[in-house]
Amino acid sequence: MKLRDYQERAINEVRDSFRMGNRRVLLVSPTGSGKTLMFSWISAGMARNEKRITIIAHRRELLKQISKALKAVNVRHSILAGGTIGIPRTNVVVASVFTLAKRLAKYPAPDLIIGDEAHHFTPDSTWGKVVQAFPDARVLGVTATPERLDGKGLGLLFDDMVMGPTVAELTEQGFLSPAEVYAPSKPDLTKARTRMGDYVTADLEETMDKPSITGSAVAHYRKLADGKRAIAFCVSIKHAKDVAADFIAAGYRASHIDGGMDEKERDGVLAKFETGEIQILTSCDLVSEGFDLPAVEVAIMLRPTKSLSLYLQQAGRAIRISPGKEKTVILDHAGNTQMHGFIDEPRDWVLTSENARKKRTDSETPPAVPCTGRCRCVQSAVTSIRPRAGRLSSGMVSWFRYPGRTMRAWQLKRLTCRVASIRYGMWGRVEGINTLTSGRSM
């Protein structure tokens, strides 16, 4: 299996970091960039040198995906999870972090521990317990979002951070799907309490599990993404069931999925979704991480969150590329885009334990703002734009995307968001404004 250029660069930078003496390295790369393939490739190289590698993850679906990736690069391995008897004898083991934590006393020390979804790593967590049980092992953490729920970085467990490509770079190169973001409504969260860094689930359920909000989600799905495969991210299992029921009542093939289902039932629902027999899948967190189905074209956000990591993980489920897929539609009924910014917005991650992101200066991109037109798209405010034609009375970058092509002034008038210029490419971001003050054509 051939690596993409950015994957090869990231792998080399990880190896260089270890050679420089760092014992615990964090690799940051977007959802959909092929992180599993990258660390499987690293595992293959070490396995050829008879090194012991343990790859830990926290969900059954992740264990399966990791095993599939290892098979693709011809790595012999075993799986350690609930129901597994004894300790695997292969040099490479894919382990449930919770099962491994219970068997640490008898588990042989690995040379390398690889942690998928490493934003869960904290010293006092199960992940931290496993890592600290083997002080001589090197550690490679992999994540798209190197930030804890409380906004702090992962510097207490990692020595160095290797930055992979950005979402914007991969979108520009055609490795991720461009996204259109629509925010038809923003929920009133003034009464929602906060606990442990995020909204209290019971308060969110009371706010979001309403016919008016779900009805709006169904209506906008019909208008903007009718018939496309969608994932709806919900607040609770009850909320997910209610949302699925409303989509079914509207004539769509929908189903919910949750961790309480047995393995056979969950696999059956996912198989139907993959084949298109189910159009809309509703879930409470179960598919926020490690869910790999590139054919998903729509993300319906019905779960407000203060967690940037959770928001990016959810939005990232829908931006993988797939044959015939031209774009991703994000229907944000939760206000997450306005709170956290666009999925491909540049983020300056840092490893320090104080704050995982550098604070923006006044000259950097302000928060997302709603469009003033009827389209209900979301825009990102910018401080200055130098358009190819016309002058701006106030500048905006629209989240609509159009095929790269020349557009005349009379064509611009037909758009719900008036535009000033287009960055040409397979798909370009439209630089839009409220008022175009010059009549020059493009």
Predicted features by range, described:
Residues H120-Y182:
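Post-DEXD/H (motif II) to motif III coupling segment of the RecA-like Helicase ATP-binding lobe
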Residues T36-W41, G45-A72, D150, I237-K238:
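Conserved Walker A/P-loop ATP-binding site and its immediately adjacent core
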Residues F98-L104, G259-R266, L270-R347:
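Conserved RecA-like P-loop NTPase helicase motor core
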Residues M1-V28:
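Conserved pre-motif I regulatory segment
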Residues K64, R76-R89, H239-S288:
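Conserved helicase ATPase core of P-loop NTP-dependent helicases/translocases
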Residues M163-S177, R195, S322-T372, R376, ...:
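A conserved SF2-helicase RecA2
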Residues M20-S43, F233, I257, T282:
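Walker A/P-loop
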Residues M161-C234, E354-N355:
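Conserved interdomain linker/interface between the two RecA-like ATPase lobes of SF2 helicase motors
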